[in-house]
């Protein structure tokens, strides 16, 4: 039920986010998608000609810069790494304000000319919705992480009308796990979000293309070569993206809230020169697949998109890198296909098929998500005939990417912040204190307790061990059921003692501020079930391995021993 609700809200959120982008683009440019009419003057300000695009990123930056800096700094950038971090290191906890700030900031950035995608933001928005809902009903952490992944899957499904790709994206990139127990909830959310989006936006393929066929075996060799090139281009995109971001960090010395507006002037000049870079750029992508642009123009647009997206992120913009990687791949594939058709007319086939395969291959090279890459292009186009070329090129692109770079476009951002998701997670036991797990109401035995009374108390004790204290509640030692049972059996023929003083074991203790890991190490060394927690030599509670196991089972904690 929760997965269904997350999917429905994410689907509705994706619709609203898309409309918000279109509305703001209309305000800033006079048209719903300026990339469809690049270079046209603003219909409400015709006197400015095409120069108005220099100002739109500046105005947008003045609006979303303070919003991000003051409202939710984690809304800056492309969003997916923040969701990955929340799932892997924060138990799925994402502040509710992120959904609101990310929606407004990304819509302003894209509507104002930012050359980024809307998929990354909607993933973060959907994940924040899932996290907020899960925390509201107090689900355990394992379920909370799943609800975050449900939101991510719903975001991709609703944005692209691609429910299969949404599921795999959530499991391959967000959860980084294909466990069967996760699959059902993610599928429900993805399907629900897609149904909600289709009911409003319609059910049609993202790109309306003629059927492509691979008619010559030699064509597969060309697809393989394209995959190798795409893997290298994907890695190049990663390096340019973070290289420009580093450059902007070194150059900028002013307040962060002003950075998008000042940097927006540079972006505006770039848009003046290459208006096709305005916003997401899907119309340009579609035209490249259908063969509108010559090879030289395609390569120029590839370079321009790489720089425009990197600059948008570098100046503090908010938007995704999913769509730009598809755009770059389409330009590379279309240029490769047109060249192949000229050089090998009997082998190459349709140039458009290379553009589609290039989209998937560059995304795979950048994101290291080969299954998502294959499915996303398949669902975007509805073109099953290219499944084998897609699988071949994507596999090679992923392999080349691994050879050239350790990190993907998503994990690189986290590694630069000192977070390595591939490294073992910091142990929960090393970061939590005994105070959180001690039993302050544990029974203690007085030193003069009769043996029979001690036996009864130990019989009711969960760990069959109890601390023994003197009249000032200072710890004397620990009495175990084994020691008492030995005396009560009377096998050695000795007279039963009147009290327990002679049966008490002297043991090490822990303080409430000791780490859980240290306390567990002590239990392991002493082969004991529990240990007394003391403060100024007085017993304040009892810590046991049993309490740790109960806590882990209830919370399904990551990184536990």
Q: Where would I find each of the regions flagged by the language model?
A:
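Alpha-helical transmembrane segments and immediately membrane-proximal extracytoplasmic
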Residues: 1-431, 435-441, 445-476, 530, ...
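Helix-loop-beta junctions that constitute the ligand-sensing/allosteric loops
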Residues: 438-444, 450-475, 481-487, 493-540, ...
């Amino acid at each position: 039920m929760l997965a269904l609700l997350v999917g429905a809200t994410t689907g509705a959120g994706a619709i609203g986010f898309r409309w918000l982008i279109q509305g703001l683009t209309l305000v800033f440019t006079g048209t719903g998608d300026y990339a469809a009419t690049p270079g046209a003057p603003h219909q409400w300000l015709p006197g400015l000609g095409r120069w108005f695009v220099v100002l739109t990123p500046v105005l947008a930056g003045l609006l979303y810069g303070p919003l991000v800096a003051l409202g939710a700094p984690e809304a800056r950038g492309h969003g997916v790494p923040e969701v990955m971090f929340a799932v892997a290191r924060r138990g799925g906890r994402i502040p509710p304000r992120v959904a609101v700030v990310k929606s407004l900031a990304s819509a302003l950035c894209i509507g104002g000319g930012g050359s980024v995608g809307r998929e990354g933001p909607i993933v973060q928005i959907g994940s924040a919705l899932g996290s907020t809902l899960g925390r509201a009903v107090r689900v355990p952490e394992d379920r909370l992480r799943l609800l975050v992944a449900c939101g991510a899957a719903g975001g991709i499904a609703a944005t692209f009308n691609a429910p299969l790709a949404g599921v795999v994206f959530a499991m391959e990139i967000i959860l980084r796990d294909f466990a069967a127990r996760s699959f059902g909830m993610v599928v429900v959310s993805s399907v629900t979000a897609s149904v909600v989006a289709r009911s409003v936006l319609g059910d049609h393929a993202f790109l309306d293309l003629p059927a492509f066929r691979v008619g010559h075996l030699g064509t597969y060799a060309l697809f393989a070569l394209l995959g190798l090139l795409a893997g290298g281009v994907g890695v190049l995109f990663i390096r340019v993206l973070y290289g420009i971001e580093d450059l902007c960090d070194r150059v900028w010395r002013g307040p962060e809230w002003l950075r998008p507006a000042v940097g927006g002037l540079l972006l505006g000049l770039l848009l003046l020169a290459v208006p096709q870079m305005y916003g997401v750029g899907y119309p340009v992508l579609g035209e490249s697949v259908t063969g509108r642009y010559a090879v030289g123009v395609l390569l120029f647009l590839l370079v321009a998109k790489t720089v425009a997206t990197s600059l948008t992120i570098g100046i503090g913009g908010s938007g995704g890198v999913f769509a730009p990687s598809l755009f770059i791949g389409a330009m590379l594939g279309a240029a490769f296909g047109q060249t192949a058709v000229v050089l090998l007319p009997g082998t190459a086939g349709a140039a458009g098929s290379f553009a589609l395969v290039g989209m998937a291959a560059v995304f795979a090279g950048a994101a290291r998500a080969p299954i998502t890459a294959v499915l996303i292009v398949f669902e975007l186009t509805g073109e099953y005939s290219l499944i084998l070329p897609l699988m071949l090129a994507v596999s090679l692109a992923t392999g080349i990417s691994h050879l050239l770079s350790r990190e993907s476009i998503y994990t690189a951002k986290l590694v630069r912040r000192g977070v390595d998701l591939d490294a073992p997670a910091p142990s929960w036991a090393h970061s939590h204190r005994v105070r959180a797990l001690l039993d302050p109401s544990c029974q203690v035995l007085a030193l003069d307790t009769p043996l029979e009374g001690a036996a009864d108390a130990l019989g009711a004790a969960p760990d069959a061990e109890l601390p023994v204290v003197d009249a000032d509640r200072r710890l004397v030692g620990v009495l175990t059921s084994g020691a008492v049972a030995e005396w009560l059996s009377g096998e050695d023929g000795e007279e039963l003692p009147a009290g327990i003083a002679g049966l008490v074991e002297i043991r090490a203790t822990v303080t409430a501020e000791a780490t859980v890991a240290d306390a567990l190490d002590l239990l392991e060394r002493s082969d004991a079930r529990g240990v007394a927690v003391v403060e100024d030599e007085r017993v304040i509670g009892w810590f046991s391995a049993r309490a740790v196991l109960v806590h882990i089972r209830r919370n399904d904690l990551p990184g536990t021993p």
